[in-house]
């Protein structure tokens, strides 16, 4: 797994070791959908409900969701408002362990089609820190760079963190 420490620095870390390191702290883990738990290239562009589930990642996240100190969130952007309902349906079907109140799905249409990376970085700036370790898992380096730029305290992990 790869962890981004500082601008340009990369460190290999294993997710289980990482979580063990914070077993006595609250962890808020935000997980992207497209390309992380759902195959981004499979199906039609606007029919998210037809995306193929990536079961190895889903199974690992389901195990993580059972840890008492981890709050697991979906953290996804969608181009159009209708994508919100499609993603909710998909989560209900393939990853129902993501609590409905922990599903952050941001519609670009409702935000003047601002780039997903900017929307995600803005959202992360407003996440209540409350002493928790904040983690974002995403497959898009552009999103990770945008989040890092304005959220230096957030731990960024590539989607490969879910594959041992």
Give the ranges of each region predicted by the language model:
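Non-catalytic pre-domain segments flanking phosphatase-related domains
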Residues: 1-31
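Short catalytic/ligand-binding loop motif for oxyanion handling, primarily in non-cytosolic enzymes
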Residues: 38-40, 72, 81-85, 114, ...
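Structural beta-sheet core signal
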Residues: 74-76, 136
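Asp-based phosphoryl-transfer active-site loop
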Residues: 25-43
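Glycine-rich phosphate-binding loop signature in dinucleotide/nucleotide-binding domains
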Residues: 24-25, 68, 127-133
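Substrate-recognition "cap/lid" segment bordering the active-site pocket of phosphatases
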Residues: 78-132
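Acidic, Mg2+-coordinating phosphoryl-transfer loop and its flanking beta/alpha structural elements
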Residues: 124, 130-164
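Short, acidic loop-to-helix structural element flanking the phosphoryl-transfer center
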Residues: 44-74, 81-85
């Amino acid at each position: 797994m790869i962890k981004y420490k500082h601008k340009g620095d990369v460190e290999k870390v294993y997710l289980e070791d990482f979580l063990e390191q914070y077993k006595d702290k609250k962890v808020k883990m935000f997980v992207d959908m497209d390309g992380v738990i759902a195959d981004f290239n499979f199906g039609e562009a606007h029919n998210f409900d037809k995306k193929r589930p990536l079961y190895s990642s889903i199974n690992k996240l389901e195990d993580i969701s059972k840890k008492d100190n981890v709050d697991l969130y979906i953290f996804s952007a969608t181009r159009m408002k209708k994508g919100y309902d499609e993603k909710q349906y998909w989560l209900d079907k393939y990853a129902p362990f993501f609590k409905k109140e922990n599903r952050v799905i941001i519609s670009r249409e409702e935000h003047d089609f601002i780039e997903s990376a900017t929307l995600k970085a803005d959202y992360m700036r407003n996440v209540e820190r409350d002493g928790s370790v904040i983690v974002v898992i995403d497959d898009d380096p552009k999103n990770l760079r945008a989040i890092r730029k304005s959220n230096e305290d957030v731990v960024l992990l590539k989607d490969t963190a879910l594959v041992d």
